[in-house]
Amino acid sequence: MNPATGNGNSESTAQRPTRNWRIVDFVLRRGFEERDILPVRQVFALLLVFGPIYGAAMGSYNLIVGNRSLTEQVPQMLFSAIKVPMLLTITLLVAIPSFFVVNTLMGLRDDFRSSIRAIVSAQAGLTIILASLLPLTIFSYISFAYLSVSYQMAVLFNAAMFGLASVSAQMLLSRYYRSLIAKNSNHRLMVRLWIFVYAFVGIQTAYVLRPFIGSPNEPTTFFRRESFQNAYIQIWEMFNQVLYSI
């Protein structure tokens, strides 16, 4: 019997969270021991559930700010919902081989399986955090509509949301890595290396997979013809455009 309510098992059952929400809570609050890290299959399930949520929000820009109807904007929202899980998965898969080589050179190969489990669990946290930023993204789009803010600002805003989610996910990663660092201090260097490699690959991958938001002056497409360019040069140019427009 529940000592607080006195209603027995029925009250306990009514208050019991669903299995999926228990997993979400597990990702965000646990992770101090290796046994607390999620299986890879559950991580990818979370990625496929929460990634499209934020992707659809990103793709709603022209529906809220522009003059496009829901019918016209649904394809972009659908494309973005598909591409956010693609972005996170491709970035993970591209970054892992070099991370494996460096771990081997550092004498940490025996712990590599545990390292990957920690990384993919943090990836699940990143996806959940992104989905939690959906209300802020929608609210910002509404504000952009009233303030006549440029499309470039919307792109930079979403980049900032991904940055915020990534920083938060790295906090989770540090927590997941705690037992490994206690075992071998070289893992601390590996965490820092992973953060750098993941961010470097992720920025370029996101640029290749664009558009996620959809320019109001261009037709809706899954990819752009000029996708394979240097992301860092283009981001710098976009940042300068925003500064000069203020």
What are these regions (language model features)?
Residues 1-44, 230-246:
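N-terminal juxtamembrane cytosolic/stromal segments of multi-pass membrane proteins
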Residues 2-17, 36-54, 84-89, 118-130:
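Alpha-helical transmembrane segments of integral membrane proteins, especially early/N-terminal helices
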Residues 5-31, 59-65, 169-180, 209:
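Juxtamembrane interface elements at the cytosolic ends of transmembrane helices
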Residues 40-115:
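A glycine-rich, hydrophobic loop/mini-helix early in the fold
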Residues 56-70, 134-139, 209-218:
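Membrane-helix interface motif
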Residues 82-86, 100-214:
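Hydrophobic alpha-helical transmembrane segments and adjacent short intramembrane/lumenal linkers
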Residues 193-194, 198-246:
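Long, intrinsically disordered, low-complexity regulatory segments adjacent to structured domains
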